[in-house]
Amino acid sequence: MASPASTNPAHDHFETFVQAQLCQDVLSSFQGLCRALGVESGGGLSQYHKIKAQLNYWSAKSLWAKLDKRASQPVYQQGQACTNTKCLVVGAGPCGLRAAVELALLGARVVLVEKRIKFSRHNVLHLWPFTIHDLRALGAKKFYGRFCTGTLDHISIRQLQLLLLKVALLLGVEIHWGVKFTGLQPPPRKGSGWRAQLQPNPPAQLASYEFDVLISAAGGKFVPEGFTIREMRGKLAIGITANFVNGRTVEETQVPEISGVARIYNQKFFQSLLKATGIDLENIVYYKDETHYFVMTAKKQCLLRLGVLRQDLSETDQLLGKANVVPEALQRFARAAADFATHGKLGKLEFAQDARGRPDVAAFDFTSMMRAESSARVQEKHGARLLLGLVGDCLVEPFWPLGTGVARGFLAAFDAAWMVKRWAEGAGPLEVLAERESLYQLLSQTSPENMHRNVAQYGLDPATRYPNLNLRAVTPNQVQDLYDMMDKEHAQRKSDEPDSRKTTTGSAGTEELLHWCQEQTAGFPGVHVTDFSSSWADGLALCALVHHLQPGLLEPSELQGMGALEATTWALRVAEHELGITPVLSAQAVMAGSDPLGLIAYLSHFHSAFKNTSHSSGLVSQPSGTPSAILFLGKLQRSLQRTRAKVDEETPSTEEPPVSEPSMSPNTPELSEHQEAGAEELCELCGKHLYILERFCVDGHFFHRSCFCCHTCEATLWPGGYGQHPGDGHFYCLQHLPQEDQKEADNNGSLESQELPTPGDSNMQPDPSSPPVTRVSPVPSPSQPARRLIRLSSLERLRLSSLNIIPDSGAEPPPKPPRSCSDLARESLKSSFVGWGVPVQAPQVPEAIEKGDDEEEEEEEEEEEEEPLPPLEPELEQTLLTLAKNPGAMTKYPTWRRTLMRRAKEEEMKRFCKAQAIQRRLNEIEATMRELEAEGTKLELALRKESSSPEQQKKLWLDQLLRLIQKKNSLVTEEAELMITVQELDLEEKQRQLDHELRGYMNREETMKTEADLQSENQVLRKLLEVVNQRDALIQFQEERRLREMPA
């Protein structure tokens, strides 16, 4: 909106300041504003009050109202909370600027130094709901009229820094550009203060500036001395960012954004991408802001194959170094991926220019993420104390697919400012540090779902943001090492005592393990456990252990006619299928007594899973939480294999016999070979030796974890996410698992005909073969009626397609009454706008609608985010149901449509972030496993070598090996937990796809449907029923496990 003609130069300076798009323009226009008003810049909060008092300008009033509202919060004490505090903030990134704004509102004197002279990055940042409200409250719409006007909530990092820079200048923050912070200069004598070492040639006033608080926001590559950084490493992960020119044409406006497509649950998209372009990705995101911004994770082999990387180098820095990346090939790669993801609707993709005037496309490594061990420290010298705090990337490097950088960065900025407030109030150093570390413990766990829902109440006080806050979670005693009194020599702390005085916890020693096994097998006929070799050779001790933990599977009398190999094989198989304990050695090795280390490792898994379980007479024992996840996935995997084996013929399900099948164990004659070879276990794929921590068991066969990968794409196979082809015997990920029968594949479409274990499976009864899957209702029932063709009304189908099972519900209540038409309308509308990353759904809101930035619209948007949708009036219900079938008609209701689209996209983003968090954690687990395997191999070799090492040393090595085994078991069970969540995401995706497909049939007139259409519609309906029942089984399993794990 053009401002009226004004003769006051201050008004012109203000308008130029608000609209400035370059750092230098912002600074020069602000200096002109201050000169025109006769105000000295950088004068703290008093400067803001002077500007506001003298600039009586209608265009500024809305901005003053917002800043006054924020400053009037009681926590700031009218700008008097930190009036005697001097702060230095290093770094003018979003987090550093946000921290500076909070410190200024507290009344502190704030000086900020930044080594750059301009903001040049185009990257687009995802925003959580509270960050949107927070930025609006600081006047974001005034400075950037297009702020969060699309269906996805994001902003370019350049625009975010510009608007925060303008707020910081108005609030009196003193900013110095082109100044690099290189370190601290301690006070030389008593009475002096802390200063900064700055380059090059800082102004004399800045060089002599003494401060008592330092906030570092200089990025992950610069962390002040004294802080310890921990590396969180995963598998090699190569990210590619690309920014294309946004011409803001009508065609570009109508291309939907992609909030995230992840291979972990949407494999068909990536399979199509690979076939069409040869590009192999893990995920891709597309945001539309100042540029068309794409970010994706590419596979190294694909980059090598397409010539983006010249050669395969082991060091990541060299692999992605300038000399090894072909710029032209990288540009072709990014352009082709972006063009495919948007169906070519963006037209000619022209790269935006980076700060050096080159095409803005880059490959980067996010294999490792750095995280500071502590968030704050205190240094004291000559009586002068300095409080140091970290915010932004130097505190926690964000994982880009999760969109947590700005959100958690802002939270850390608030927490750091709260720490400064407590410091200014006179709280002791240890108390301040303990509170700050208590908050830091919460940071990595925060998400929009586990914070306070009312984002309007968020403020500097942590209690307004974090529910169930405990500021004493970390005690002052625990942070003494963060208080550095440089004048004194510290006595050795308890934490610095030699390792020999530390006690080991969390794993059983061999004596404790042997005693536990003796207790579990006591009273079983013919069993007397005295060691970890000969006592287990006949298989009876292992059967006794399984019998004690799972009564009813096999009575002692039934073992009389069973041979040692048969009994041992039975015990190993039942322990895996019914208790979730995967073997680490073969039945022959147990019989030969040749691998006591392997047996100790195997039995320690029993101990960790059942040591706290009480066994009452007749009571079926249950494994503790995480082993039950392994058990669930094992049943799911076997169910998938059985389903594929019964493609050509249906066979009635029967209980699996207690004797082993020939294919599940090696032949008996191999026993002598094992006896001679000692502890030899060989990988069945590569034929190389398997050490204990390397062993990965599938159906009684052992592999290296690194060897157990998809035969087609060589991707790592995780529990519940692979299948074995009965023809060639190879293992495949579900994406590349060959179809045995093409007709069946056509019937199933994109769905794998998996049958989830029903909740009854978790009661540890014998593992029967699953009954034939009925297409109408796969959930077993006491009396299954004859199958019949289901014909539902349109409304019944609409209700079915809108089902959404909530995984975190309590115990199952009685069936709910049918939902109101209002609920159905909202669900229908929401489904009509969901794109789930495949941009073929409803077009975006026209740009003309997005651009509205008047105050009434802004307030309306804020209300929409803060409050739930109001109940619909009865007369609107039928209208909205009709609109759900005709999304084009929603142009008549832009507010509803914008709100529903935004909320649908928010749900999509949550789903994508969840999938990416799982993927990242799985990669970290795999990397940690490799480290444990390498360490365990060294210990195992030392233990197996005939040497003159003292027994005490061997016992120490054995205890260390057991601790590594315990760590591995914990990682395996965590991996299983994650894969259950993957199954949940996969079923949600299948339900969404089927819902969309069914809605397409429903939207057609009944009279226009052919017989083939009717057949296909019923087929989709049957599949939808299957998926809904599978989700129900999964949720019931999770609920039963949750109830089982609750304290009595």
UniProtKB/Swiss-Prot annotation:
Gene3D superfamilies: Calponin-like domain (1.10.418.10), Cysteine Rich Protein (2.10.110.10), FAD/NAD(P)-binding domain (3.50.50.60)
Residues modified to Phosphothreonine: 475
Annotated site (Important for interaction with ARHGAP26 AND ARHGAP10): 816
Annotated Zn(2+) 2 binding sites: 710, 713, 733, 736
GO-annotated biological processes: actin filament depolymerization; negative regulation of apoptotic process; regulation of regulated secretory pathway; sulfur oxidation
Start-end of Basic and acidic residues biased regions: 488-502
Obligatory cofactor(s): FAD
Protein known as: [F-actin]-monooxygenase MICAL1
Compositional bias (Polar residues): 747-765
UniProt lineage: Eukaryota, Metazoa, Chordata, Craniata, Vertebrata
Keyword Coiled coil attributed: yes
Swiss-Prot/TrEMBL keywords: Actin-binding, Coiled coil, Cytoplasm, Cytoskeleton, Endosome, FAD, Flavoprotein, LIM domain, Membrane, Metal-binding, Monooxygenase, NADP, Oxidoreductase, Phosphoprotein, Zinc
PROSITE patterns assigned: BMERB (PS51848), CH (PS50021), LIM_DOMAIN_1 (PS00478), LIM_DOMAIN_2 (PS50023)
Compositionally biased spans, kind Low complexity: 654-666, 772-787
Pfam families: bMERB_dom, CH, FAD_binding_3, Rossman_Mical
Gene field: Mical1
EC number: 1.14.13.225, 1.6.3.1
Binding, FAD: 95, 114-116, 121-123, 181, 293, 393
First-listed, main subcellular location of the protein, grouped into a coarse class: cytoplasm
Domain notes: The C-terminal coiled coil part contains the plexin-interacting region. The bivalent Mical/EHBP Rab binding (bMERB) domain, mediates binding to predominantly Rab8, Rab10, Rab13 and Rab15 (in their GTP-bound forms).
Domain spans labelled bMERB: 905-1048
The LIM zinc-binding domain, residue ranges: 681-743
A GO cellular-component term linked to this record: cytoplasm
CDD domains attached to this UniProt entry: CH_MICAL1, LIM_Mical_like
Reactions catalysed according to its record: L-methionyl-[F-actin] + NADPH + O2 + H(+) = L-methionyl-(R)-S-oxide-[F-actin] + NADP(+) + H2O; NADPH + O2 + H(+) = H2O2 + NADP(+)
